[in-house]
Swiss-Prot record:
Keywords: Acetylation, ATP-binding, Ligase, Nucleotide-binding, Nucleus, Ubl conjugation pathway. The active site is at 215 (glycyl thioester intermediate). Catalytic subunit of the dimeric ECR1-AXR1 E1 enzyme. E1 activates NEDD8/RUB1 by first adenylating its C-terminal glycine residue with ATP, thereafter linking this residue to the side chain of the catalytic cysteine, yielding a NEDD8-ECR1 thioester and free AMP. E1 finally transfers NEDD8 to the catalytic cysteine of RCE1. The modification N-acetylalanine is found at residue 2. One of its GO terms (biological process) is protein neddylation. Induction: No accumulation in response to auxin treatment. It comes from the Eukaryota. PROSITE patterns: UBIQUITIN_ACTIVAT_2 (PS00865). Expressed in shoot, root and floral meristems, in vascular tissues of cotyledons and mature leaves, and in the stele of the root. GO terms for molecular function: ATP binding; NEDD8 activating enzyme activity; protein heterodimerization activity. It is found in: Nucleus. ATP binds at residues 56-80. This is NEDD8-activating enzyme E1 catalytic subunit.
């Protein structure tokens, strides 16, 4: 039989699917979309993306972004790999247990996707200088913590500047794409500070963390979680006075588990397991690999849409529920025009004689701020830092000087203040906000009717 003529296979371009989005027009493109190879190359060569979190969602995000044409990625995560991560955080292997998540995730994606460069950062997000985050075009969030989201939201909104008419300056907008999952549920959202609601504008979407009354834990435990929290919150302090409990220390977790078992047996309560103990103590949110994959895909697509304008971005909050079938919905939430984080800032009118120390006291007394232990920055100029002690000592002499002089004798300017805000339950949270300072009596400044309590 004669040999059949088999046509040679044409190699498929790695960017074939991406080219369909970036090289041609469409009915749903953003008005600013300019298709062409140059756009694809710019995304590859110049766009820098920071992925925060290298867990279940973060692993998916790194993979999806690398396969979507982004070549300059960085990832930050403070955690190390645990055995319990391996079933859903697909970039990790058993031999990786104990290693930093960010470093292993970056290494694995670079091994699989040629040409991509991923810089890992094994650290807390708070340990990075604020300007570190300003070096990126987009920040993609794969976090499981409300506190971490609020911190990054404050940082990104801190870069935002407003025009005289209180419209945001486009070049100062730091886009964020936020994803979150819990079991079969998830969300993806686009945050354009000053344009769409920031995280603080919609904080009401997140329910308060469940807390157990201590009297219930001590006297009438009714379920396994009560027994675990009793061992964690009460017995640990009683037995190990002065020793800090470390949830990432296996010996500490084993001690809590053993004590919870004894407590449960005493009251005839079933269900205490080691995995449940970890979940209760560390407030672990249940995660499913398929949910992470779906939400990550939505986040990666929104990231591509923001940088390329190949389609209009999500407006502005996508919810997903895969518990009973498949359900998605997009909701348009509105900005809080008086938001202390993404808004133009609280307006405070001062005399030119007001000292920095007096101004910091005013921040604590202001009814809309209630900001204690405040640090103050004016652009790149640090006026005062509460911590670390060596910096506080360095800036301390400024406290007695007029704020007007420290700010370069400008008539008005926007400054950033970082401190702790009092909550209704007497707890405090770290926050960043903007304050618009106007000096009465300075040349060229007309009297304003906005007082310190406005």
């Amino acid at each position: 039989m004669a040999d059949l003529d088999v046509p040679p296979q044409v190699p498929q371009s790695k960017t074939r699917d991406l080219d369909k989005l970036l090289l041609r027009h469409g009915n749903l493109v953003d008005p600013g979309f300019v298709p062409g190879p140059g756009l694809r190359d710019d995304i590859r060569d110049y766009v820098r993306i920071l992925v925060i979190g290298a867990g279940g969602l973060g692993c998916e995000l790194l993979k999806d972004l690398a396969l979507s044409g982004f070549r300059n990625l960085e990832v930050i995560d403070m955690d190390r790999i645990e055995v319990t991560n391996l079933n859903r955080q697909f970039l990790f292997r058993i031999e990786d247990v104990g290693k930093p998540k960010a470093e292993v995730a970056a290494k694995r994606v670079m091994e699989r996707v040629s040409g991509v460069e991923i810089v890992p950062h094994f650290s807390r997000i708070e340990d990075k200088e604020i300007e570190f985050y300003n070096d990126f075009n987009i920040i993609a969030l794969g976090l499981d913590s409300i506190e971490a989201r609020k911190y990054i939201n404050g940082v990104a909104c801190g870069f935002l500047e407003y025009n005289e008419d209180d419209t945001p300056k486009r070049e100062t907008i730091k886009p964020m794409v936020d994803g979150g999952t819990e079991g079969f549920k998830g969300h993806a959202r686009v945050i354009l500070p000053g344009v769409t609601p920031c995280f603080e504008c919609t904080i009401y979407l997140f329910p308060p963390q469940v807390k157990f009354p201590l009297c219930t834990l001590a006297e009438t435990p009714r379920n396994a979680a009560h027994c675990i929290e009793y061992a964690h919150l009460i017995q640990w302090e009683t037995v190990h006075r002065g020793k800090t409990f470390d949830p990432d220390e296996p010996e500490h977790m084993k001690w809590v588990y053993d004590e919870a078992i004894r407590r449960a047996e005493l009251f005839g309560i079933p269900g205490v397991t080691y995995s449940l103990t970890q979940g209760v103590v560390k407030n672990i949110i249940p995660a499913i690999a398929s949910t992470n994959a779906i939400i990550s895909a939505a986040c990666a697509l929104e990231t591509l849409k923001i940088v390329s304008a190949c389609s209009k971005t999500l407006v502005n909050y996508l919810t997903y529920n895969g518990g009973e079938g498949l359900y998605t919905e997009v909701t348009k939430f509105e900005r809080d025009t008086e938001c202390l984080v993404c808004g133009p800032g609280i307006l405070i009118e001062l005399d030119t004689s007001v000292t920095l120390s007096k101004f910091i006291e005013m921040l604590e007394d202001h009814p809309k701020l209630l900001l204690s232990k405040a640090s103050v920055k004016q652009g790149e100029n640090t006026l005062y830092m509460q911590a670390p002690p060596v910096l506080e000592e360095f800036h301390r002499p400024k406290l007695s000087k007029p704020l007007y002089d420290l700010m370069g004798r400008v008539q008005k300017d926007t400054i950033h203040v970082f401190g702790q805000r009092a909550l209704k339950n007497n707890e405090k949270e770290s926050c960043t906000t903007k304050v618009r300072v106007v000096f009465k009596g300075a040349d060229g400044v007309a009297d304003m009717d906005t007082a310190i309590g406005a």
